[in-house]
Amino acid sequence: MSQHVKSPEPTESPKPRQKPGAACEECRRRKLRCDRRQPQCRLCEASGVECQVITARPSRGPKPALEGALLQQSTTNFSGPTDDHPLDTPMLDDQIDLSGWQLPVMDDESSLNGVYAASKANSSSGTIMTNAGSGVNSISPPHRSSSIPVELTMPDVGSHIKGMENVEDICEPKISDLIQADLDQLYFDRIHHFMPIQHQSCYFSWRRQPIKTEAQSCLQYAIWTLGASVSALHENIGHSFYQYARRGLEALDSKNMSLASTDLEQVQAWLLLAIHEFMSVDFRRGWISAGRAFRLIQLNWLHGTDGWDLTRAQTDWIETEQKRRTFWMAYCLDRFMSMRTGSPPTFSERVAIRLPCPEANFQNDQPILMGFLSDALAADTSITSTFTECIVVATISGRALSHRNQCLAGDLYFSAVDDFWNRHQWINAILTQRMEAFSAKYPLDMQQQTDPMLLFISLMWRTIILHLYQTMACVIPSHDEKRDLVTEYKKRSSAAAQEIVDLTNKLSHLNSLKVHPLTPIPLSLCVEFLILYHKPGDVFTKQLQDITEAMRNLKRFSNLGQEVLQLFDDQLLTTSPFQSSTVH
């Protein structure tokens, strides 16, 4: 039986990945794929910039004429051998003593800066000026005369440095008025509720001005950075805003200014960039940026007391209230991040700064006299805003952290066990009182459904319980007479862990772009607790799976939980018992 072999059918050539034609300059600058649409691509149309396409570009590669000129020049320079440098003798043989070379030795960073400054000023002569002002030839050993031209032995350092600076310069992003308004609205709709430090009327009054201070310009782009980060439509342009804002803030920090000249907008911009970096860059970068804001606050905001005068001009009250809110936002960020890292907080809770007023009073320019933090911690105090609730839970978080650090250093300072129990009962009493007051004002269904800020605060309350139990379990020995209290608190921590899992399951019903940006912090601490105390097949195992699944769903919007997720994955792959370690 004859077999018929079918000839292979011609296959269509794969479609090219890019459309024909050249990409526009804006897409090339941003390293994005251009759709090559005419007369404007979609990116340029959305950004409001001119769509410019350059088709005639200079040819690249080696240039024969230039190579010939360089070869002729080098031949001319080496055509006449001198007595000091015969052609058959290497320039750097074993008989040349290199120890006598007069190369500049850099003792510190200031010397290096001086050398670079001198090199730019003397690049035409090919010498480097030391601090003493003596010219040192680039590579000429002592007592020898070189016939090699300086132009070949010492490149133009100044021109190289200038070229690098030009490459690193970041142009101010240009966007249309429509996109600007959209980014402002996104910020106040999705970010301001978590960071209520901006007075909207004041912001828009200076934002629309053609001339702004450097600090205001940095704050504007920091706001747009966060606005773009919570928008699926504009997230591709947020990085250019971030780079421009950060470069401007670094330039401001490098200026030699007096201690009392820090602008409010400069501190606010650093805080906003820190939040963005925690979410989208990495923890270390965000922690350093937050530290810059903390130091600026410490320089000139914590001196004196917050007075009783409500008769000052309206603009003065608004600025003072913005400073209060900016400080308390930094205070909360400081304590929540310290809970994650285990490091001591930067700010003390004993500050003479009044609590922020209700949001309605703030935005409507209605001055009201608020109390201090000690007043809000009292058992019978009714708290008027979720921002103040956040400050209270941050304060108790800091006390729990300080309690643990004192226990770890107890052997060095001969701390007695009685001191531990006194501190624990003091913290636990205020924790129970404020947690009950919070639950009475905001029922559980309200915490789960309407307000991501309330959900975050509720998670933090229960995380403090887990934190206190871990401290007890590590410090109290098994033969202690109060070991029964440890067992009782373990039951309370198990219930708190289950409540955290229940609250976490509600995250799937929320828009991920509206979730509190620091939500991975309590979730990470809960995962560490469950990893430490779970046994295969027990109830903690199911809780661990649920909470890690929720964290994976938030992975796209926040980088804060990456390390603990990796820790969980490593735990699944290993059969050795888990040993606790600090995860940053």
From Swiss-Prot:
Gene: dbaA
A molecular-function term among this protein's GO annotations: DNA binding
GO terms, biological process: DNA-templated transcription
Taxon lineage: Eukaryota, Fungi, Dikarya, Ascomycota, Pezizomycotina
Location(s), subcellular: Nucleus
Chain positions covered by the region annotation Disordered: 1-24
Highest taxon of the lineage: Eukaryota
Purpose: Transcription factor that regulates the expression of the gene cluster that mediates the biosynthesis of the antibiotic 2,4- dihydroxy-3-methyl-6-(2-oxopropyl)benzaldehyde (DHMBA) and its derivatives. Probably binds the conserved motif 5'-CT/CCG/AGA/CG/CT/A/CA/TT/A/GC-3' found in all dba cluster promoters and that shows significant similarities to the binding sites of other fungal C6 finger domain transcription factors.
Protein name: C6 finger domain transcription factor dbaA
DNA-binding region listed in the record: 24-51
